[in-house]
Amino acid sequence: MAKKKSKSKSSSPKPKVSSTAAKPVEIDNQQNIENVQDSPSALQQQSATAEESENTATTATPSEGTTATTESSPVTTSNETDPIELSVLDNADHAIDSNSIKSTEAVLETLDSELNTIADTKTEPPTEQELNPTLAKYMRSCQEGNLTIVKELISSGQVLVNDTFSDEITGLHWACINNRLSLVKFLIANGANPNQLGGELKASPLHWACRNGLVYIVDYLMRNSDADPNLRDAQTYNALHLAVHSSNIMLVIYLLLSCCSTDSVKKVYIDEPDGSNRTALHWASYQNDIFTINALLRFGADVSKVDNSLFIPLHWAFMKGYKSVLKALVEAGSDIYFKNDQNKNSFDIAKDMNCSNTWEKVLIETGRDPKNNWAPLKPWVSAKLGKIITFLTPYFLLPLSFNVLSMGGDQGGFIIPKLILAIGILGGGIYLLNKLIISQYIFDDKKLAKSPILAGVFSATAFWSVLVWLYNILPTTFIHNFFANVIMAILIAIFTWSFFKAMFINPGFVPTPADNNVILSQVAQLIELGKFDTDHFCVNSFVRKPLRSRYSKHNKRLIARFDHSCPWVYNDIGVRNHKIFITFVYSLNMAIFVFLYLSLQYFDKVKDQYDSDDEGEGEGFVCSILGDDMCYGYKNHHFHFNVFMWDLFQCVWVSFLCIVQTFQILKGLTTWEFSSLNKQLQTNRFNHSTVPRDFEAGEGISLDQTQPSDGQHRHNHNEFQTCMNLLGIDQFILTLKMSLKSLFSNTRHGNNNTNYDPLTSLHIPTDHGIKQNWLDFWIIGEEKWRNVFYLPIDGENNLNGKVVDYYTLYSYH
């Protein structure tokens, strides 16, 4: 009997009727923090019971409408039985008298389907929607964005714009949460109250829009109504708190510029606490939202604010333990020793959350000394002096390694052991440099790649090559190879000048307004165009992004017509130094070829007869590969020969770089744009855009002017991939692939017999033909030879034969 009782109860639950109250969706808990008391997620769980009884309407993403069931009816289970069939059961003995339900035994012995049928016959009271179908129609039309019906109902006086059911949710609430901008405009124009509190959370329409990150709705409410961002809902959250909950960085930036500037009309205190004394920075740290954290810190958010659990934002950041988030908070001045109400500091919390290793890396990368109780490290060398030492160190390591290879003179052997020793000296010297010097002024991960060491390697190579040319080659070959030596001298002058010029010149920093009002005006322009997203606004530098620009982590600035970040010149390559960089690369490559040619001429002129019997161990095999001239240099001019071979190796990747850069220039592309071509064939990226579907841009404005993101792309590069990137081989391979596909692809589409060219199938708005692209790169202004030697003063350069300013280039038309 007990088993039967359980079965009957589980199979015939009481129907559950949805209420009419509704509110926006709560933010999701992002981390299980059961062992931490009074977490931010606990505030959301306080309303969990209320959420279960919400309206069947569900909030949707900006691309999906939100609808609600306005007519409630009893819900039946899948075992529902028509009441007419109650009199005709499988067996007449099974007929049920309703009076027998009073008996427990009768209930237990009754068939499940029969109990369901009896339950379904109960009459439910009419809902508010059923009692007032006109208002229900109005609410449903606001949800669906049916402006015609809403206008008809309001103009006819059948409903008032602020009419609600008992939940006090207005039509404006529904229009806001469903991103119906046209409807919001109409309702506000007809007197809708933007501060009406409704739903279980007693939230305003602005709250609903902020919770879902709807920038365009928030902007209209803020600028065209008296919507109050300081109003609090039942959970004590204001508009800024809810914007942070949405994790839409564009909305957070908008509210910071609109409400947290010194001269904001609708002022919001950036560290305004909620009911648990948690600020917006607490919530952003809990969510590990690095973009929001950086934005809040930029506007002066206090990292020392304490909530009711004595948690500072740093403590909440350990819930996920992202290194970038922890690092940003420590660099902003967070107290790593501050203790919460459980008497735990950041080290204890890191241990509890199993991220102690990450925490130690963060402290090291923020300049903390592990040998001194993590106190701030006191560098014994300044950053400027450290960079100079780093740059000059290869000037000593390279000749030392070359001399090791020359040990033994003309009787030398043991080629492989000497090569290993030379590489060990070079690698060991760089390792010590990294530990002793670079670590004193660069605390980030991958210190070597962020230091001027590679620029030093190149300049040291050029320095010793020039010395060899001056003291060995030039005196011997000056007469017989006069023109080659003159060309060599000219090329040395060109690549030396262009190298240092490309290193120290401003690559094209897009000016960043110092006045927040200017930035806000740029944001307003983007909103008007429907382009306020991460493709058109830089969330790192807070400036409107010109086309072809990108944020540089090296200089921490937005670079106009960004090409790439080059460790060999220790600078970014942009609109102002790209021509200089190409001049450097071309002249360097030609200089290497001329140096190799003159070296062979030198060996040929000074070589003497040598007896093969005097060859050292392994030299017979080496000479059989090198030939007479090279073998003479190998046996008699060891340092020169080693420099020759080192330059030959450098020539490989420099040639790759020349090929890739030339190809890209002829196609009207930068390195960054070329790398992004294959991504255009993939699905669209999320760029935090919340443009309403009914948004109407200004006259003549196109919404398709997009560009690759500024890079918040993330790669997990291994050491091999990093090496490929440094040498430019990855770009060469990509160029080779696309070139071969263009030449030999016979892909056919359907019944069309035309060949498919991957280079022409993608839309490249900067490609105006090979000749025009080449002229645009080298010439500024009119197509005259003298203009080839002009460098951009600001961001000017040619595009399709016309001068454009890449600092303010927002459209190709």
Curated annotation (Swiss-Prot):
Q: What is its main location?
A: membrane
ANK repeat segments run: 133-162, 167-196, 201-231, 235-264, 276-305, 309-338
Enzyme Commission number(s): 2.3.1.225
Among its keywords, does the record have Chaperone? no
Q: Which topology term describes how it sits in the membrane?
A: Multi-pass membrane protein
Which reactions does this protein catalyse? L-cysteinyl-[protein] + hexadecanoyl-CoA = S-hexadecanoyl-L-cysteinyl-[protein] + CoA
Q: What does this protein do?
A: Palmitoyltransferase specific for casein kinase 1.
Which PANTHER family does the record associate with it? ANK_REP_REGION DOMAIN-CONTAINING PROTEIN-RELATED, PALMITOYLTRANSFERASE HIP14
What is this protein called in UniProt?
Palmitoyltransferase AKR1
